[in-house]
A protein has these predicted regions:
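Acidic, low-complexity, intrinsically disordered interaction modules
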Residues: 4-55
Length: 55
């Protein structure tokens, strides 16, 4: 079962089977922008993508 661990008007971070995914929200559509990654890599991914989010 998936669990949303963070969501705002630009991005949603989802956990699924101990992997994390980042979905970008554009014009009301969710665009899958990451493949399952470890939690340790999540903050680096968000920073590199230009988001000021720290989990």
């Amino acid at each position: 079962m998936e669990r949303v661990i963070f969501e705002n008007s630009q991005v949603r971070v989802v956990e699924f089977k101990n992997k994390y995914f980042v979905d970008e929200i554009m014009d009301g559509e969710v665009i899958s922008s990451s493949i399952g990654m470890e939690f340790e890599d999540l903050n680096d991914y968000l920073k590199d993508a230009g988001y000021s989010i720290v989990l």
